[in-house]
């Protein structure tokens, strides 16, 4: 088990540690005439949980495939664990744990057999595979399902097994591509708990996600990607403080009313965003915004005052919501 101090240190730092486990400078990926990743820079420190946040097509998965040494870079430099993927790909992959966006489990094998066979790929002895499999089944809360065929597992169980399998080689860095896509809320929260336990152990996590709450829960630091570029970087709290107000007021009006609102909303908030189904008003005191709106005779059908999130950061940076 790795020492837990790097995780604690990383979470208290505003800048990357001097020694990076992963370092990219001008990292670029092209597919013919299309640029999927456009000259991005980032560092991942030991013990850090680092995220790539952005919509589908932003370049997140292409970046992860380059880090995982399964897709060559088209330009710039990339160093992983101090090595060059173009030269040291097999050595790097032996020290990584990879959780792809789509599960690649052997459906006809049992839960335990999936772990044992994967361990053999890394040259582990049968006894060592068995020991690690027992530990990982317990970690993934799948001990009671060890003899079940994978095809009989729920989506959340399959995802936990995929993560457990990626840990069989005791990796220094975990790569997780959209780890909770398609899972129900209960399964997502259970998976977050397992990943948080890995953070506590000091395992370095690198993940992609388009879920704002997931990024806020798991990431010490993240980059926001859009159209193949990095448009912002920082901790979730730093990004929200920099690009949003403390609170957001969401007002929904009857159909046809939105087009008549511009003059009536002017001056109510520091920033106003018009979405197809609602208006967002950014100000530190949401209740004061609601009172001022009512004082102007506005009658929204629904009112919601909430704290700002990374969704608001993305909207500020790109002019659209992450769901667009």
Write out the residue ranges for each language-model feature:
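Conserved ABC ATPase "signature" region
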Residues: 116, 120, 127-145
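ABC transporter nucleotide-binding domain
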Residues: 192-284
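Catalytic Walker B motif of ABC-type/P-loop ATPase nucleotide-binding domains
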Residues: 174-177
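Conserved ABC ATPase signature
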Residues: 149-153
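Conserved ABC transporter NBD signature motif
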Residues: 76-87, 91-92
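Conserved catalytic motifs of ABC-family nucleotide-binding domains
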Residues: 170
């Amino acid at each position: 088990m790795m020492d837990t101090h790097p995780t604690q240190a990383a979470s208290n730092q505003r800048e990357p540690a001097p020694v990076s486990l992963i370092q990219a400078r001008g990292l670029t990926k092209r597919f013919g005439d299309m640029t999927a990743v456009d000259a991005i820079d980032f560092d991942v420190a030991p013990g850090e949980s680092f995220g790539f946040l952005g919509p589908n097509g932003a370049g997140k998965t292409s970046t992860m495939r380059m880090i995982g040494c399964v897709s060559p870079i088209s330009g710039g430099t990339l160093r992983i664990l101090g090595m060059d993927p173009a030269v040291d790909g097999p050595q790097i992959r032996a020290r990584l744990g990879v959780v792809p966006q789509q599960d690649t489990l052997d459906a006809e094998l049992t839960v335990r057999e999936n772990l044992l066979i994967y361990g053999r790929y890394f040259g582990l002895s049968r006894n060592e595979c068995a020991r690690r499999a027992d530990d990982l089944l317990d970690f993934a809360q799948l001990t009671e399902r060890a003899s079940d065929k994978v095809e009989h597992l729920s989506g959340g169980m399959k995802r936990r097994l995929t993560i457990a399998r990626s840990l069989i080689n005791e990796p220094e860095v975990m790569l997780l591509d959209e780890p909770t896509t398609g899972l129900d809320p209960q399964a997502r929260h259970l998976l977050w708990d397992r990943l948080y336990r890995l953070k506590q152990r000091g395992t370095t996590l690198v993940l992609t996600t388009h879920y704002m709450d997931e990024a806020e829960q798991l990431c010490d630091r993240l980059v926001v990607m859009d159209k193949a570029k990095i448009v912002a970087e920082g901790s979730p709290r730093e990004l929200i403080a920099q690009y949003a107000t403390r609170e957001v007021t969401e007002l929904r009006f009857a159909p046809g009313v939105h087009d008549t609102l511009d003059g009536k909303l002017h001056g109510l908030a520091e920033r106003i965003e018009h979405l197809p189904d609602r208006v967002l008003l950014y100000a530190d005191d949401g209740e004061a915004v609601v009172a001022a709106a009512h004082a102007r005779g506005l009658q929204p059908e629904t009112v919601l005052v909430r704290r700002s999130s990374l969704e608001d950061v993305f909207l500020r940076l790109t002019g659209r919501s992450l769901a667009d």
